[in-house]
A protein has these predicted regions:
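Histidine-dependent nucleotide/RNA phosphoesterase domain, centered on the 2H-phosphoesterase fold
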Residues: 1-169
Length: 169
């Protein structure tokens, strides 16, 4: 079987997507770029990359042993990332529970010979790609989102770009 492109993420519920959509609507009108379909909004925890299909059940079982603390993020601004040319919704701070979850996932992935990225973890939700440069936009009303769990996600390429879907056990 071929490899699949995977990552761990905090997947947004329909209610969370609607809340963000309503909050971002007035802000996104000032952003030039391709707005990401809200059905694909997520917070990446750890990028895995190409992963053997036959190993996925073992990865799911190993990740299933992790019991994360509840995670709460307060998103309060829209930032532009120059190198990636994306508009990202950013939280005010990174809670210890989120840092602990990322470390646990990275440790779990070591058993599968997946090395953690060597860069600072910055939780975010990408809301536009191929964006033009803009100044940071503070949200008039910060948005608090909470998660009790995380998902193993697959990135599936299609004619209109990548789409994301959770892989359920």
């Amino acid at each position: 079987m071929p490899d699949r492109r995977l990552f761990f993420a905090l997947w947004l519920s329909d209610r969370q997507r609607e809340l963000l959509r309503d909050t971002l609507r007035p802000v996104l009108t000032s952003v030039e770029g391709a707005v990401v379909d809200r059905r694909d909004w997520h917070v990446t925890l750890v990028f895995i990359g190409a992963f053997p299909d036959e190993q996925i059940p073992f990865l799911q079982a190993a990740a299933g042993e992790i019991e994360p603390e509840p995670i709460r993020l307060r998103f309060d601004r829209l930032d532009f990332w120059q190198r990636a040319k994306v508009a990202t919704l950013m939280p005010r701070a990174v809670p210890p529970a989120l840092e602990a979850l990322v470390r646990s996932l990275e440790k779990t992935l070591e058993a599968f010979d997946v090395k953690a990225e060597d860069r600072l973890y910055r939780p975010h939700i990408t809301v536009a790609r191929r964006a033009r440069n803009f100044e940071t936009v503070p949200l008039t009303r910060p948005v608090d989102l909470e998660w009790q769990d995380f998902d193993l996600m697959e990135s599936v390429s299609g004619p209109s770009g990548a789409r994301y879907r959770p892989l359920k056990q």
